[in-house]
């Protein structure tokens, strides 16, 4: 069909789309195949990428159309096409609602990469709107953290000089450690190369300890920090986590110095997310090896390198390799600096879109590939800065004087550029400036002597200018392992045999003498079983010798470097990859990879497919001398194949469930529910019910999962109901494939467990679908290992980016599917071998043979599977009953799984009949094959069968174009004389009400109208009712009321915008949808008051709207915030909107726990009763960070001599220098001593904040185990703003007897008066009482150093009183315990009296750091002075000083109390400001400033 009327709207304006923020925009270069109209093809492309089908299906409704992807721009002459994807289309996590990059890729470069009418389509840019971008984590750590570790601050820290230990493979543990030691003498950073990890010859548990020893030695010797990037890539997320934990256990206190490298392209985005979420504090080093398979300019499939790196920032890479922008050996161009800008700037222009990152951390560019000191200056000049990470292997290890000097030379390359840039060499060229610098710096001068080809090219005349008259080539320094024996104490080195010779020429070499051996015999290699064999089509660039290029390819794929390096030994050479066959005329090349090269799991020693891909299509995909290189086949020897799991379940298990035995069970008739996106839960269940009346198997399509409009917890129960009903009615088992794909492995596991909990005894009937190409092999392994009994349905959407015959990069579709069997897919989509709509050829049947047979021939190798279970071919893409017979005849059998969407839902008589017709297509072929129709053609045989089978006859009437093509003369033979096209049956949802008992369907009211224009609506008639009375709303108690300051954008009506705001915050959509009924409207949020002049708006939210716990039915603050300041914060028509107050009705308030402990419990412990216990004098141990355990304990001891309460400051917890298991015992000792000495109880607040709730609980339990009988004296501090309300609830529910100390650090990001988004500080603190904080910091109400105002006392009243007025509402707390105000921030004894007077009482907790530790006589006296500040105010309030001012009253008190008098002498600026004339009144004539007492730790012992 020409779908342009539905999937294209060229009137859409890009600026408007961006302003509205509801669409992801994607720019493609797309070319239709010859003879196809551009717009029609573009619309088909958008349809295939969203909700579309090849034929009209009976399940499309208006809501479906509202989430169509739309082509909004085309330029056929330049092959440009832009598509807008509604953000609702994309899948979300069920665990946290976050976004999933695999979902974006599944749609944007999924099935559209294999379309029959598209020559090619490649993403050149994309734009994520702000609200959608916020669903992605972004980086948690980046180069700023590296700079901090290196002691360079956090801005403009410059070049991080790093290396790759060369050779990339081949070193054993001790030589590896020695190489690290040598480089770190001069450099900063070492990375594992992408294939390194846990090879048999260099196991992680032997290698990492050597690295740690080397790091410790170098840190000690050089006085500088060092960094290491350890490769944790694995197929299995559990293996990645195990690797990461092991490495951190070895690095210990140096853990922050260790980055984790992930091969993000070959292992997939799931691996990246696994690393980031499990190790959020480690620098996530994204290695892109293999990306050139897709990104290369040589192909127009997939996406560009720019897009690939932009994606890396979205998904949270700390750093990613970006090539060398033409200044190194890899493909690239100087304009690639735009890639770096997109990674590092907060706003940056791509080729088509400007992306605003809205404060998302930058991703740091990592440069490598032929770089050395001589190439760096021009690179920096092109980029404009040097804030990148360098990993120069040859540039350091290839330097004539060794890696230390090589590293220093690279740093000098940066310095030379900086000095030239600053004009220090005068008005000369950059090349001459570097030469001038080199005259006085031997290290970079040595780089000229080493890398002379580079010098000749970049620095003309350098020999004369540097006075060099020597030979044209200089040898690299011999890295003498024996000489390095002096390092043995540090790196556990062993002395290598003296015979080793590794001093070789230092130019770009023909490496065929080492990496090629054409005498090797393939049969012998296979018999020996020690090598993985890989066959490529490879073409060198013009002017390059074939064998030399092939050898370079093998070197780059294994142990090689561009230059000879000083670390190569005999063992290294034993694991070289070897070219053993070439045929330049046919561009054929074969390489033998020693099996020892490949990485293994540390948990179980099993193989890792990501390691194979990293070597076989890793860096070789971007080589400067290679035009292209693509894998066409590979061979795994038996012993190596056994290291892979293979499938655990396959179609035989399906047949068993379906009652067909376990052999030759034939076609499994399945479908994709169409449209693939757009159906809501009940219609989805109804569609399942309808198909299963005739069919076997339904799959979620690849982008389906947990969309907002079709959430898993609503959809899966409908599917289960439908399955149960159909099993009962038809007497046959049914099968369903549920999509569990996610970026985060934990999310995948959570999805799988939830689905199985719903299917219950039908769990074996449920397969799990994984988008194996876009999410990567790690996701496949995650599924297989966690759910070994489920059919693992591998969807390959997007694979065409690599496998398409249009490109000669990466690997073929044959290789891709062969890999799927190795890694354990139960079934994989294999196309339709030219019999459907997708690209393919009849010879693709060899793919199926390789998947299903125990021995099979590929294009180059025969593979013996040695009993490994088969992987079942899944066919889809335009298939229907008419196309199946010829497909089976070509394949030779029908033991496949069919997922025919249009073939069932497009059938004129509906999906049940469509499914039956497909089964009849198989039966017709079988009968013809058995000769039941005599000696006639297959097409005539199918026609004969159709004469007596109405269902397949109906397929002829439905799919007439196919009938005309495949079955000539069918109309006459079947006696058909009707119209040439028949409409698909209308799938009437109301008629489907007969299924209500099974799928929970309800019949829509007849009056419902849902066919509306696709424009933004004025929703005020539905979402606003200004006649509502606030007092009545409060009396009725059915609504939460929220008062906002809201301003529409220019040109928008206030009421219409307010109604849109309420709609967006509750039940609304941008267009009317067919699922709205009267109940929906009953829970609409309603605008009940507006004052446009003052920008005031009030909304009433029905309490039924809010989410509740499934465990206990209690309320959830996150649900309130999601609605009240959720999506409305990113609306295109709203300038700003901020909550200023809210009201919770009594019955709703009771759903929240409130505080379980508060200051009354503190007073009781302190022996002050439970009412009016007054000020709790506390402090923060200063400095907030930096004290070690014993000094920390001593500081506690000193303060507790006079004070009550000490809190960990918000960043304190378990720093390396002050670990919790060392610090807390010191605190307990100090508390015990002070309780005994002073006779008074003491209190401590320990910070248990952590990202992981399990970590918080572990911290809390440990602390209580240490405090023992003093546990009630210990509060738990939670950084409630930065860690979120979930952390607060975690603490309160797990430790209900502890005082919950809510620290609000960071809240100013939202609450500051400087912004009109989010909510105010008043609202933030009011929320804290609702969710159960015992105490919260409230600022100092203008009396301290923090922002605030005297009127902020209303915050304290709302926290402490049982009824209190906010700016808009009076809240009755109905006996809910109070939350205690905590004051800090510049407070001391002199500031307290006026604070108490403003507040009206002193029932607060003070945490005064400077006010105690800053007192001239030390913290004990400082604490006592604060208590005296309260007492002075009380006495003045009681009139004990007569009718004088408060300031004079405090001075009177001070005359007889030395401690507070000392505060006057210490804090003289405060005294001058608050107490005029204090010096004269106190008789003080001394100096104007007094130093604080020296806190002598030794004296304090």
Curated annotation (Swiss-Prot):
Annotated site residue numbers, Transition state stabilizer: 329, 837, 1345
- The top EC class is lyase
InterPro entries found in the cross-reference section? RuBisCO, RuBisCo_large_chain_AS, RuBisCO_lsu_C, RuBisCO_lsu_C_sf, RuBisCO_lsu_fd_N, RuBisCO_lsu_N_sf, RuBisCO_lsuII
* Residues reported in the UniProt entry to bind Mg(2+): 191, 193-194, 699, 701-702, 1207, 1209-1210
Q: Which residues carry this modification: N6-carboxylysine?
A: 191, 699, 1207
Q: Which SUPFAM superfamilies match?
A: RuBisCo, C-terminal domain, RuBisCO, large subunit, small (N-terminal) domain
Q: Which cofactor does it need?
A: Mg(2+)
Q: How does it assemble?
A: Homodimer.
Q: What does the miscellaneous comment read? A: The basic functional RuBisCO is composed of a large chain homodimer in a 'head-to-tail' conformation. In contrast to form I RuBisCO, the form II RuBisCO are composed solely of large subunits. Synthesized as an approximately 175 kDa polyprotein, imported into chloroplasts and subsequently cleaved into 3 mature RuBisCO proteins. All 3 RuBisCO copies are present in this protein.
- Know the name of this protein? Ribulose bisphosphate carboxylase
Q: List the source organism.
A: Symbiodinium sp. (Dinoflagellate)
Give the taxonomic lineage as stored in the record. Answer: Eukaryota, Sar, Alveolata, Dinophyceae, Suessiales
